Curated annotation (Swiss-Prot):
Location in the cell: Periplasm
Keywords: Periplasm, Signal
InterPro entries: Lipid/polyisoprenoid-bd_YceI, TTHA0802/YceI-like_sf, UPF0312/YceI
Signal sequence extent: 1-22
Protein family membership: Belongs to the UPF0312 family. Type 1 subfamily.
Gene symbol of the encoding locus: yceI
SUPFAM superfamilies: YceI-like
Protein name, per record: Protein YceI
GO cellular component, one term: periplasmic space
Amino acid sequence: MKKSLLGLTFASLMFSTGSAVAADYKIDKEGQHAFVNFRIQHLGYSWLYGTFKDFDGTFTFDEKNPAADKVNVTINTTSVDTNHAERDKHLRSADFLNAAKYPQATFTSTSVKKDGDELNITGDLTLNGVTKPVTLEAKLIGQGDDPWGGKRAGFEAEGKIKLKDFNIKTDLGPASQEVDLRCTGNSGHYHLFFF
């Protein structure tokens, strides 16, 4: 259980809403409606879940023109939290996130393409001093009016990253070579929410 890891689910994470008009959005981290989460196999027997507590980001969403969409996210890697202080300390070390040297991870989209009901969001993920392309699949769950007179849209986004792609060489066993990225949430105009 001591080694588990990393994540960056984040990344991911942040994207799509269901507005009919192109608009700029900011991730709502102040209202505790946004989360950057990850999971990784633990010895092939169970899942280890974690989150990053400190992050920020923006995106532009145009339902009619996904090619114009943009996503930018910055994560403070020192904020990793797996509900275990010693493990978190190890994850921040040079064995994994190397947070002292690389205190931020970033995701910057390079393309967004519609694929049936999904949006494929491809971008450059920089983690542990390494930049690699990552694709996230985002799906609109539903949209409509909220009780306060605004518009909301719910979505789910998923992706995977390989540890070795980001120069994370600590051997966690054959079942623990990839980190699953997953975000589910809803968004409103000017804000993006992850639950």
